[in-house]
Amino acid sequence: MSITPSFSRRSVVSLLAAGAFSSMSAFAQFRVEVSGVGMTQLPIAIAPFRGEAQSPQKIGSIVKADLERSGMFRGVDAGGVVADENTRPDLASWRQKGADAMVTGSVSPLADGRFDVRLRLWDVVREQDLGGQSYTVTKSDLRLSAHRVSDFVYEKLTGEKGIFSTRIAYVTKAGQRYTLWVADSDGESAQSALASPEPIISPAWSPSGAQLAYVSFESRKPVIYSHDVATGKRRLLANFRGSNSAPAWSPDGSQLVATLSQAGGSQIYSIGLNGGDPKRLTQSSSIDTEPAFSPDGRLIYFVSDRGGSPQIYRMSPAGGNAERVTFTGSYNISPVVSPDGRWLAYVSRVGGGFKLHVMELSTGTVTSITDTSADESPSFAPNSRLIVYATQQQGKEALMTTTLDGKIKARLSGAGGDIREPDWGPFQR
């Protein structure tokens, strides 16, 4: 049985046959809407920062949205109380209001046009000062400073690194124009990386966060390029005979794996970044595509219909025998492994729809975590706690984030638009 054209948005067959993008107008900026109820969330009060009323960015509001979106925190209404980092709040009264932690701070303009952002974190239960931070930033980096505040608070209270100052990449289509965007993890501050009248698909961050690999159709066939995020320069990575699609970086950034059809059928190859012939890794007569490395580089997960329907397999990075991974459901695609190596996210066809699933790799336990039916392109946050994915909600294209149990979701899309192919970048170095 061959794989149908709906096999994957990352596959070339899908893009050509299914018309992956609609004609709706695209929105590059996002509105975060958090839904769901978590039972183990830490209640935290984030008071409006002193001076933020005159600031271009409302730091306290951004921090509150970040922490709630993580699924680890529940905001406690600060009641409009403004408090800075130098004033000790009445922690006993905040405890009575239900808060276990509290953030206070200030944002002040400097004479040179920059801003001074300061915060202090309080343990309300123990009535302790947990420390603070300060950031001197330009006006354009005020939102980034708010995300760094969120990172500080998250790490102090959970012991894990925060992901709020990381970035996501995604693709939009407006009319006949395709654009690759790089944005904050909440979807704001989006910057156009490149635009084209021809389709752009499959953006993939390099492990360093300096490069984005992607597939362009500007040559009337799929070709893989890398885009330098800092300079905007691009480099040709794969333009072999036939199609070149579904790029994925090795964890050390030394090579790509991709789907090539230079020998006829779609097979997986490794590609050196310094040229040379690609090395064929799969040797089947079926369609093999959508490769994804495990974080330790010891395995490559991929999709194949060699068993009669699309399923997820894994193999050594040197190729050879493949082991089937998915057995629940007759149609499973778009595998991605969490950075901690514990989880496999993928999309499964259920009753005619496509839903995001998560498998615990140590046990094989599978959980469906969405109630939408057009999910695609999952990508893990670098701390493995959240997944960003594309879907349709109430008839509109959307980017969503979800916790791994599916309880807390945040819609990152605006009122409408064609927004696809999200990929979550690594921690900033």
Curated annotation (Swiss-Prot):
Keywords: Cell cycle, Cell division, Periplasm, Signal. It holds the Pfam family TolB_N. Residues 1-28 form the signal peptide. It comes from the Bacteria. InterPro entries: 6-blade_b-propeller_TolB-like, PD40, Tol-Pal_TolB, TolB_N. It is found in: Periplasm. GO terms for cellular component: periplasmic space. Belongs to the TolB family. NCBIfam families: propeller_TolB. The Tol-Pal system is composed of five core proteins: the inner membrane proteins TolA, TolQ and TolR, the periplasmic protein TolB and the outer membrane protein Pal. They form a network linking the inner and outer membranes and the peptidoglycan layer. This is Tol-Pal system protein TolB. It comes from Polaromonas naphthalenivorans (strain CJ2). The gene is tolB.
